[in-house]
Design a protein with these regions (language model features):
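HIT superfamily nucleotide-processing domains
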Residues: 1-135
Length: 135
């Protein structure tokens, strides 16, 4: 049983922000930024690629609602909504979850994207995606 399933079952304590029959939202123990919250379905899905559409929509609706509350509660200057899918992308707990990361003007947390455009053929990438979507 994964650590989030143990939290959902009450075997491990957590700081619950929100709970209903389908969803649990808890404070992330790392608090990468003040108010950093995790939103997860109570039903176990390993990641974004395996969660059902119905459960995904429930989680994301609650993410939106909680993001508004958290930004307002801490007077944040912005917010990142983040999901890591699989270990290579930084997923450390194999139970689908979404991070709400309030952002503040004076902080050290960086989420940056490196420009690889010179190494990529955008037309080829687009064709590959469209071909896969057509199947």
């Amino acid at each position: 049983m994964c650590i989030f399933c143990k939290i959902i079952n009450g075997d491990i304590p957590s700081k619950k922000v929100y709970e209903d029959e389908d969803i649990l939202a808890i404070l992330d123990i790392s608090q990468a930024t003040k108010g950093h919250t995790l939103v997860l379905p109570k039903k176990h899905f390993d990641n974004l690629l395996t969660i059902s559409d119905a459960e995904y929509l429930k989680v994301m609706k609650k993410v939106k609602d909680l993001a508004r509350v958290i930004v307002d509660a801490f007077d944040a200057d912005g917010v990142n909504i983040l999901n890591n899918c699989n270990e290579v992308a930084g997923q450390s707990v194999m139970h689908f979850h979404v991070h709400i990361l309030p952002r503040y003007n004076k902080e050290e947390l960086k989420i940056e994207f490196t420009d690889h455009s010179k190494e990529c053929d955008l037309d080829s990438i687009l064709a590959t995606i469209k071909e896969k979507m057509a199947k």
